[in-house]
Amino acid sequence: MKFSSALVLSAVAATALAESITTTITATKNGHVYTKTVTQDATFVWGGEDSYASSTSAAESSAAETSAAETSAAATTSAAATTSAAETSSAAETSSADEGSGSSITTTITATKNGHVYTKTVTQDATFVWTGEGSSNTWSPSSTSTSSEAATSSASTTATTTAETSSSATSSSTAELSSYTGAADAITAGTGLMGAALAAVMLL
C-alpha cells in the first residue's frame, strides 16, 4: 500500500513540473464535429473526499468532469447555432399551399436549409378587404358610422377636459413677489392687497 502511494505521489510531482495540462475535447452534434482545446493548471492537486483518495485519480476525475461539462456546453452551442440557421432560412419560401376556410386562410410555408426541411403554418383573416389608396379606403366588415361616433365622443371628451383644466387654472391665484425701491432701501412685498397697502404707505 505504501509503495503504490509513493508512485502516485511521484506521478503527481512529475505532472506538477509540467505546469499545465492541455486537453482536447471532441463533441458531435447533428453530424457536425466540434473540438475545443483546454489548458489547465497542472499544479492543482485535488485531495479527494477522504484521506485515502489518491491525488492522481482525483485529478483525473476532475478532468473528466470538466471534459463532460465542456462537451455539454459545446453541444448546446451547436444546437443554438442550428436553431439560428433555421430561423434565417424560414425567410426563403420555396413552396406554399393556400387553403381557404371561409373567414380565414391557412398557408403552409416550406423551406429547406442544409438538408433540413422546415414548415410553418400561418392563419390569416379572410375578411380583410383593401380597396386602394383613394378616399374610399374601407376595412370590411366594420362599419364607418361606428368608428366616426367613437371619434366624435372621444373629441368631445377631450374638449371638456381641456375646458375644465383651463377654468381651474383661471380661478387659481398665485402669490407673486415684486420689488419696490423706496428712497431709503429696497422693500419686497406681495402683489395682493397687503402689498398694495404697503406700497401706498411708502409712496406717501
From Swiss-Prot:
Induction annotation: By iron.
Lipidation feature positions (GPI-anchor amidated glycine): G182
Keyword DNA repair: no
Gene Ontology terms describing biological process: siderophore transport
Topology class, membrane: Lipid-anchor; GPI-anchor
One Gene Ontology CC term in the entry: extracellular region
UniProt keywords, alphabetically: Cell wall, Glycoprotein, GPI-anchor, Ion transport, Iron, Iron transport, Lipoprotein, Membrane, Secreted, Signal, Transport
Biased composition (Low complexity): 135-175
Secretion signal, residue range per the UniProt entry: 1-18
Location relative to the cell: Secreted, Cell wall; Membrane
Disordered: region residues: 84-104, 133-175
Superkingdom to which the source organism belongs: Eukaryota
Propeptide part(s) removed at maturation, as residue ranges: 183-204
Protein name stated in the entry: Facilitator of iron transport 3
Taxonomic source organism: Saccharomyces cerevisiae (strain ATCC 204508 / S288c) (Baker's yeast)
